A protein has these predicted regions:
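Conserved P-loop NTPase mechanochemical-coupling segment
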Residues: 12-15, 97-147, 175-188
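P-loop NTPase motor core
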Residues: 29, 63-127
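Conserved helicase/translocase motor-coupling segment
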Residues: 295-296, 316-337
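A short beta-strand-to-loop transition that corresponds to the Sensor-1 phosphate-sensing loop
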Residues: 101, 170-171, 205-230
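Walker A/P-loop-proximal flanking segment of P-loop NTPase domains
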Residues: 2-69, 74-83
Length: 337
C-alpha cells in the first residue's frame, strides 16, 4: 500500500508549479527550455491557445528565477532536467507577477480596476521583498497614489540597489479580448492606442525590468500595445519553442506508460492505440511553419489529462472526447480570428 501512495497524482486544473511538485503530482518536465529562453532577447512574448499549460509553465519560471527560492532549488528542481544543469541566473531576480485575467468590468470601470489590480500587486511586491529595501522606501511605495508612480519608484530604487527584476505577465490580452468581443473596436482602440492606459503601462514596463516574459492567447493586442518593442522578442513561432507548451507524443507515451507500470490503468492497455485514438482530437496543434514537416505536433495538456483520468476511472476513452471546459474557449477564439 505504501507503494500505491508514492504514485504521482494526475494534476488537473492546477496552475501552480510549486503545488504540483510539493503535492507529488505528475509534471511533464519543461525545464530544458530555461537555458534556451535565456539565450533569447531579454523581453519575450509567447502566444498559445488556452489549456496548453501556460500558467504552470510561467509559475515554473517564477519559482526558478525568484531570489526567495534560491535555497529551495534542490527541493523544487532536483528531480528535473535543470536540477542537473542549473543556469547562472537561477534565483537571481525579484519577480513581479501579473495576471490580467483578474481585471474586468465595463469600460468606465476598466481603467480604475486595472490600476487597482496593479497597485495591489506592486504593494505585495515590496512587501514580499521588503528585506531588500529600506522601511522608508517600502512606506513610500505603499503611500504612492497610482500604479505608475509605484512602478517608477520600484524601478528606480531597484536600479540604485543593483537588484535584478523579472516581470512576468500572464493573460496579457485577457481583458482586451473581452473588450473587443463585448464592446467593439472603438473601445478597444481607445485603451490600446495612443494615450490609452494599457498602452501607457507597457511603455513603462519597457526598459525598466531586466527581463520580461509576456504570454496570452492571441497576437491581436500584441501589435497594438507593443509597437516599439523589437520584433525579435516574439518567439511564438520559433521552431525551437514549438513544443515548449503542450505535450509531445513522447510526453504522452511516457505518462501513460508510467501509470500502466504503476497499475493505475488496465494492464492490457495498448498505449500506441490510445495515442492514435487521441491524435485526431488532441494534437492538431503546430505553431512553427518549419515544425510542420520536421517536428511532431503537440497535444493539448488539459485534454490529455481529461482522457487519462477518464481511462483510469472507467478503463476506456471518455464518451465526450472534448473536455466540456474547453468548449467555451473555442467560441471565444472564433470571434478573434
Amino acid at each position: 500500500d505504501m507503494e500505491q501512495k508514492q504514485v504521482k497524482r494526475v494534476p488537473y486544473g492546477v496552475s501552480d508549479f510549486v503545488k504540483v511538485i510539493c503535492r507529488n503530482q505528475y509534471y511533464v518536465d519543461k525545464t530544458l527550455y530555461l537555458p534556451l529562453l535565456e539565450d533569447q532577447a531579454d523581453y519575450l512574448f509567447f502566444i498559445r491557445p488556452r489549456r496548453f499549460g501556460k500558467s504552470v509553465f510561467i509559475s515554473m519560471l517564477h519559482a526558478y528565477y525568484d531570489v526567495l527560492n534560491k535555497d529551495k532549488f534542490q527541493e523544487l528542481f532536483g528531480d528535473l532536467w535543470v536540477g542537473k544543469h542549473p543556469t547562472s541566473l537561477q534565483g537571481q531576480f525579484l519577480v513581479l507577477y501579473l495576471d490580467f485575467s483578474q481585471v474586468g468590468g465595463n469600460i468606465e470601470q476598466l481603467e480604475d480596476r486595472f490600476d487597482r489590480y496593479c497597485r495591489v500587486r506592486l504593494d505585495s511586491f515590496v512587501d514580499v521583498y521588503r528585506q531588500y529595501y529600506s522601511d522608508d522606501f517600502v512606506k513610500k511605495v505603499l503611500e504612492a497614489e497610482d500604479a505608475i508612480d509605484k512602478l517608477i519608484l520600484i524601478n528606480d530604487e531597484s536600479k540604485k540597489l543593483n537588484l535584478s527584476t523579472y516581470l512576468i505577465i500572464d493573460e496579457y490580452d485577457n481583458f482586451t479580448n473581452t473588450v473587443l468581443n463585448e464592446q467593439g473596436e472603438d473601445v478597444y482602440w481607445a485603451i490600446t492606442h495612443a494615450e490609452g492606459f494599457y498602452r501607457d503601462i507597457f511603455k513603462k514596463f519597457k526598459g525598466n525590468f531586466d527581463r520580461i516574459f509576456i504570454t496570452g492567447v492571441s497576437p491581436v493586442t500584441l501589435d497594438d500595445v507593443t509597437s516599439g518593442f523589437n520584433i525579435g522578442w516574439h518567439i511564438s513561432t520559433k521552431p525551437e519553442f514549438n513544443q515548449m507548451l503542450g505535450f509531445s507524443t513522447e510526453d504522452v507515451r511516457e505518462m501513460f506508460t508510467y501509470y500502466k507500470n504503476n497499475g493505475m490503468i488496465r494492464p492490457d492497455s495498448d498505449i500506441e492505440t490510445i495515442i492514435n485514438e487521441m491524435k485526431p482530437w488532441y494534437d492538431n496543434y503546430c505553431f512553427a511553419k518549419s515544425a510542420l514537416e520536421t517536428q511532431c505536433k503537440v497535444f493539448n495538456c488539459d485534454m490529455v489529462l481529461y482522457y487519462l483520468r477518464n481511462y483510469m476511472n472507467t478503463g476506456e476513452a471518455p464518451e465526450q472526447m472534448i473536455d466540456p471546459n474547453t468548449k467555451t474557449d473555442y467560441n471565444k477564439m472564433r470571434k478573434l480570428i
